[in-house]
């Protein structure tokens, strides 16, 4: 990752923390990170607790939003490839991170997600 930011604090966070998948009940509240990454190469997320991994790749998108909630019973991960961090339009524009399309201009993007399991689920 080139950059990892915590949505709630606005502070930089470690890549290891952003991709860490905790066990069910390991966190009391959601965590949201926005990362700037080479999504053409992809980002792999792995959950030792469940034996599941995901490889997320994208073309034309340089940011990845990761929403994680490992509370019990809700155990969820949201993955959002995007063209800017989820700071809101005004904050992204102020930081020079909001892409703009000119009239008549087009852009294309593609997203691929590959999921695998390395152990048998009960």
What do the PLM-derived regions correspond to, one by one?
Residues 1-58:
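Active-site/ligand-binding surface loops and adjacent short beta/alpha elements
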Residues 44-122:
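Active-site pocket scaffolds in enzymes
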């Amino acid at each position: 990752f080139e950059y990892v930011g915590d949505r709630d604090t606005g502070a930089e966070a470690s890549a290891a923390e952003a991709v860490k998948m905790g066990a069910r009940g390991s966190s009391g509240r959601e965590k949201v990170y926005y990362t700037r990454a080479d999504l053409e190469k992809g980002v792999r997320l792995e959950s030792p607790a469940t034996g599941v991994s995901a490889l997320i790749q994208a073309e034309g998108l340089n940011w990845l939003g990761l929403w994680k909630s490992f509370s019990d019973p809700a155990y969820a991960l949201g993955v959002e490839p995007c063209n800017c961090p989820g700071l809101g339009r005004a904050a992204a524009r102020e930081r020079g991170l909001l892409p703009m399309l000119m009239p008549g201009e087009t852009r294309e993007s593609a997203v691929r997600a590959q999921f695998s399991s390395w152990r048998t689920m009960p």
